């Protein structure tokens, strides 16, 4: 199995590459790509770690060598948030990066599963889908917005509040991957109860956790390490599912036929071809149902922004 990381020299990319080198199944190939000339050196550094995962690194403007034959392609390339920015502020730069990289994936590795990490995920996944459609290779079962960071934050914050081991807490997080579109379904957590105020405070903290990190780093970066952990967790499970392991369920932001929104984060049963089945996200409390309805206009606008971007740029290229 070959796994490619595009944006591998960045804060998320390097940490993600390390985790994948440690945790991918034996004899996997880990292929790293970035514009930065340091990328082959990152691969060389990782290659000294004693695991049976082969690492290769590529730098420059053409990612072809990195993605040829890849089964899974993880895209973290782009600029990171700085204080005062939200994920939508990243759009103008990151939209073009995603469009160009996904266009190359469509050309070189059209059968690969693609995991989008680059923010704003609500929009960049829609961009990726439109690019793949334009190339005639779109498979909705193989395109994922990686939102696992919202899940691991929710699980950690609940465990912290209730004095529980983090590994014993499971939280279903639905919706999108920014601000109010992130909806932790706290009412479904087994064996844990919350006051109304705890639900309000926890929901807000989970939704704004990215800002919490950006501000704490005081201009020195965003949530690179926890995002790398989350992306690795998702990618490893996806690799296991592609290899035939059954019963693997992960949440991700996908084109899953949800009547609420063209793209929506919800539980997925993964299989040998990507998404095997989109699972229902279950019953919501009245608070959660209200929050879901309130988020939809934001989510729809984020998606339309991505669709419009691709439509306009493709039209400009033709003219």
From Swiss-Prot:
Homodimer. This is Malate dehydrogenase. NAD(+) binds at residues 7-13, 34, 94, 117-119, 227. Pfam families: Ldh_1_C, Ldh_1_N. Belongs to the LDH/MDH superfamily. MDH type 1 family. Substrate binds at residues 81, 87, 119, 153. GO terms for molecular function: L-malate dehydrogenase (NAD+) activity. Transmembrane segments: none annotated. The keyword NAD applies. It comes from Psychromonas ingrahamii (strain DSM 17664 / CCUG 51855 / 37). GO terms for biological process: malate metabolic process; tricarboxylic acid cycle. Catalyzes the reversible oxidation of malate to oxaloacetate. It catalyses: (S)-malate + NAD(+) = oxaloacetate + NADH + H(+). GO terms for cellular component: cytoplasm. The active site is at residue 177. Its EC number is 1.1.1.37. The lineage of its organism: Bacteria, Pseudomonadati, Pseudomonadota, Gammaproteobacteria, Alteromonadales. Keywords: NAD, Oxidoreductase, Tricarboxylic acid cycle. InterPro entries: L-lactate/malate_DH, Lactate/malate_DH_C, Lactate/malate_DH_N, Lactate_DH/Glyco_Ohase_4_C, Malate_DH_AS, Malate_DH_type1, Malate_DH_type1_bac, NAD(P)-bd_dom_sf. SUPFAM superfamilies: LDH C-terminal domain-like, NAD(P)-binding Rossmann-fold domains.
């Amino acid at each position: 199995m070959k796994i490619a990381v595009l944006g591998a020299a960045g804060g998320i990319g390097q940490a993600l590459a390390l985790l994948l080198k440690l945790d991918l199944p034996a004899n996997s190939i880990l292929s790293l790509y970035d514009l930065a000339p340091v990328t082959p050196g990152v691969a060389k550094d990782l290659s000294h770690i004693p695991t049976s995962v082969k690492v290769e690194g590529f730098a420059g403007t053409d990612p072809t060598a990195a993605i040829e034959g890849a089964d899974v392609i993880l895209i973290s390339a782009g600029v990171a948030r700085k204080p005062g920015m939200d994920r939508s502020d990243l759009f103008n730069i990151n939209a073009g990066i995603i469009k160009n990289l996904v266009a190359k994936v469509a050309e070189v590795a059209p059968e690969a599963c693609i995991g989008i990490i680059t923010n704003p995920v609500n929009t960049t996944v829609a961009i990726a889908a439109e690019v793949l459609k334009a190339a005639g290779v779109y498979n909705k079962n193989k395109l994922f917005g990686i939102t696992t960071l919202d899940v691991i934050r929710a699980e950690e914050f609940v465990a912290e509040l209730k004095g529980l081991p983090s590994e014993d807490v499971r939280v279903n997080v639905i919706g999108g991957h920014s601000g109010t579109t992130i909806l932790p379904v706290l009412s479904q957590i087994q064996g844990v109860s919350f006051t109304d105020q705890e639900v309000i405070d926890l929901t807000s903290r989970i939704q704004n956790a990215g800002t919490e990190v950006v501000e704490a780093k005081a201009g020195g970066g965003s949530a690179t390490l926890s995002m790398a952990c989350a992306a690795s967790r998702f990618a490893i499970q996806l690799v296991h599912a592609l290899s035939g392991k059954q019963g693997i369920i992960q949440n991700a932001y996908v084109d899953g036929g949800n009547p609420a929104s063209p793209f929506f984060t919800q539980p997925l049963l993964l299989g040998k071809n990507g998404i095997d089945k989109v699972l229902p996200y279950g019953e919501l409390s009245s608070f959660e149902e209200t929050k879901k309805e309130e988020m939809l206009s934001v989510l729809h606008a984020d998606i339309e922004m991505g669709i419009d971007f691709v439509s306009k740029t493709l039209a400009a290229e033709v003219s």
